Amino acid sequence: MADNKSCPRVDIGGQAVLEGVMMKAPDAIAITVRRPDGTMVVQRKEYTPASKKHKWMGWPIIRGVVSMGSMLSMGMSTLEDSMKMLGEEYEEEPTKFEKWLAEKLGKNIDKVVMGVAIVLAVIMAVGLFMALPAGVEALTGWLIDLFTKGASAAPAWKGVTVTVVGGITKVVILIAYMAFCGMVPDVARTFRYHGAEHKAVYCNENDLPLTPENAAPFTTLHPRCGTAFMFIVMIISMILFLFVGRDIEAFWPRFLLHLALLPVVAGVSYEVLKGLAHSDNRFTRIARWPGLQMQRLTTKEPDMQMLEVAIVSMNVALHGMPENAPLTEEGWAVLTDYRQSEKGYAFTDEEKAAILDKADEDDDDDDEDDDE
């Protein structure tokens, strides 16, 4: 077995998926899930950042917009991949509509479904976090006019009040949405894998050997988390609109202005997130605190098995797929121990045979259950 040495320090992050963790290294993405039989299935895909293809996409502000779009697309695709990797027991019987789509679209159905899912996610996000707050802002402006009726002019504080109320509304909606998601058992379990991802990242950042025991003591709250990013977006948005368009009262012009400036808000927020994450002083610790507290809603304490999954993803993202590992028909590696993902680990023929035999037994059991 290879010595369990720490990973080289590189910029690596990830996300929780169904019963697993995705880790993104500078040049690859690894997804690991734990199947009901206890085995871990892992895949690795080569990854080239957009900034390497087009230099201008790595410029400040612009890179934040690119990163947001990339993570949305990547998040959807990794969730789909994790469901496939979990096996048939997690796949629902396709509906008549899905069967009809499959006949019409053939191999392109996955791309179409993914595109529709992304569009729906964007529409929901825009509706919840932009249209609804804009409506509250319009209502607030109307109420101010109602209670100051008879005044020669609108009060000077009206624009500021409307903008602050809109910003607070966004934060309240975000908190309520995340709290509601955490009440769903499957999502709550995914939040535990989210915590495992953060602990593994901390372990790597502190140059410790990647083991569940070393990762466990770390907090589940990480300054570079997407939850913190969303909170920063809300705050930057509120600050920006204190100066831009605060006197626009009608719903549609105000909503469209917020929508048009969303890329600017996202780009600035990304730079703020990176700055706060990579600096450690009294000011940055205070500024990071609200975003870290928001993560108490989206991360939960993982168990040791979840930490093992996160560590496998990190090892594979950094070092590549385990050599000579037993593979599924799809080319995914099957592991029974997180140490099998360490760089330089060599599977024995006996190990491979035992893992494949176990997989065959589980498949036979599933077939018998289907026959019953």
Give a label for each model feature:
Residues 109-127, 218-244:
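Transmembrane alpha-helical segments and their cytosolic interface motifs
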Residues 2-17, 21-23, 160, 164-229, ...:
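Polar-ligand-bearing catalytic/cofactor-coordination segments
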Residues 56-81, 165-191, 262-278:
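Hydrophobic alpha-helical membrane-embedded segments
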Residues 3-11, 16-17, 51-58, 98-114, ...:
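Cytosolic juxtamembrane amphipathic/interface segments immediately preceding
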Residues 1-87, 94:
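Divalent-cation
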Residues 52-55, 68, 75-94, 98, ...:
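Multi-pass alpha-helical transmembrane bundle typical of ion/small-solute transporters
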Residues 89-148, 158-183:
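Hydrophobic alpha-helical segments characteristic of transmembrane helices
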Residues 81, 85, 122-151, 233-266, ...:
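Juxtamembrane "helix exit" motif at the C-terminal ends of alpha-helical transmembrane segments
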